[in-house]
């Protein structure tokens, strides 16, 4: 399911048009993104937790030349599903 399909599904469940449902979905994504940018965790009970995780610096290899390179430390968004979500997926 892509973003457009998600908007259509949410709008259908709310009984509104896609045009009316789109801003709600957009605002949820924007709010989660802003929270992660500011270093906050976003926990949704029964669904999961979005957070930013630190990736340590490491050595890598250039696949074309085989030369060893340094890969700097970075931050990456991560999602940890809640037990209820895991159980719901397993039950299908």
Curated annotation (Swiss-Prot):
Q: Read off the CDD domains from this record.
A: HU
Protein name per its UniProtKB record: SPbeta prophage-derived DNA-binding protein HU 2
Q: What does this protein do?
A: Histone-like DNA-binding protein which is capable of wrapping DNA to stabilize it, and thus to prevent its denaturation under extreme environmental conditions.
Residue positions where Phosphothreonine is found in the record: 4
Any coiled-coil regions, as ranges? none
Q: What are the start and end residues of every segment in region (Disordered)? A: 55-77
Question: Which InterPro entries does this entry report, sorted A to Z?
Answer: Hist_DNA-bd, Histone-like_DNA-bd_CS, IHF-like_DNA-bd_dom_sf
What does the UniProt keyword field contain?
A: DNA condensation, DNA-binding, Phosphoprotein
Pfam families from the UniProt entry: Bac_DNA_binding
Q: Does the keyword DNA-binding apply?
A: yes
In its UniProt record, a GO molecular function of this protein is:
structural constituent of chromatin
| Subunit relationships | Homodimer.
According to its UniProt entry, one GO biological process term is:
chromosome condensation
Against Gene3D superfamilies, the record matches this protein to: IHF-like DNA-binding proteins (4.10.520.10)
Please give the family membership noted in the entry.
Belongs to the bacterial histone-like protein family.
- Please give an example of a GO cellular component term from this record: cytosol
């Amino acid at each position: 399911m892509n973003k457009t399909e998600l908007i259509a599904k949410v709008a259908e469940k709310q009984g509104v048009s896609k045009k009316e449902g789109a801003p709600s979905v957009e605002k949820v994504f924007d709010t989660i993104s802003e929270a992660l940018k500011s270093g906050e965790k976003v926990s949704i009970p029964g669904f999961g937790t979005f957070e930013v995780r630190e990736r340590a610096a490491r050595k890598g290899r250039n696949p074309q030349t085989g030369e060893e390179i340094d890969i700097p430390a970075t931050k990456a968004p991560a999602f940890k599903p809640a037990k209820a979500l895991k159980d719901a997926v397993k039950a299908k």
